[in-house]
Amino acid sequence: MKLIKTKGIVLKETNFEESSKILTVLTSDFGKIQVLSKNCRRLLSVLSACSQPLMFCEFVIRKTKDIYSISSASVIESFFELSQDVNLAIYSGYLIELVDSFLEFEQKNEDVLRLLLNSLYLLKKGKDPEVVSRIFEIKILVYTGFFLQFTQCVKCQRKDITRAFFSFKDGGLTCEKCKEENDIEIEIEVVKSILVIVATNLKKLNKISLERSLNNKIKTITLPYIKMVLQKDIKILDFFRFIQ
């Protein structure tokens, strides 16, 4: 079988047989794939370090009939320390759950991979997890084609909106004339902040700051909209609310 080299971050792990794991890995070349890490649970396995969630590695893999399997692997960067802090474990788990939910298997999306790596790095360096989460929510909507229309009214295309509303049904802004009963009013400051996040390069995400009140206002839009897009609840958020 031909050996293939790729880089990727481990999203999830499932124990397989007595000493192996099935890993869900987001790779740069093949998107989200499942990979067999054979005998990685043995005490002296050379694959054990690269067979845990939050590990960004270079993998040498081969494609068998039904699944990829790891031939060798080396760690590029470890985000494992995030799992050792309860709050950071939840926030990093939230980002990973979003990635896993938005991407189908073998759906290549290098932007999402870079977004995840940058966001985990920001968490690792101590940036406010709530700010990182809002940035991530907006960016992943952009990179997966579900971004909200925030530059004009989704119905009449008017751009000079002085009083803005948000339509979950239509996925964007509505003006005062076009708004419907269930549309919620949002401040222009919120609209501007979201557009700044959209326009900011991934390498400059660390420069974005959001006051707590502004962050919460953005959350009232992004969380329900993501739930509507995915048509399911994000499970880890329920646990987060429980421990708070």
UniProtKB/Swiss-Prot annotation:
Gene3D superfamilies: Nucleic acid-binding proteins, Recombination protein O, C-terminal domain. It comes from the Bacteria. GO terms for biological process: DNA recombination; double-strand break repair. GO terms for cellular component: bacterial nucleoid. Signal peptide: none annotated. The keyword Manganese does not apply. Belongs to the RecO family. This is DNA repair protein RecO. It comes from Caldicellulosiruptor bescii (strain ATCC BAA-1888 / DSM 6725 / KCTC 15123 / Z-1320).
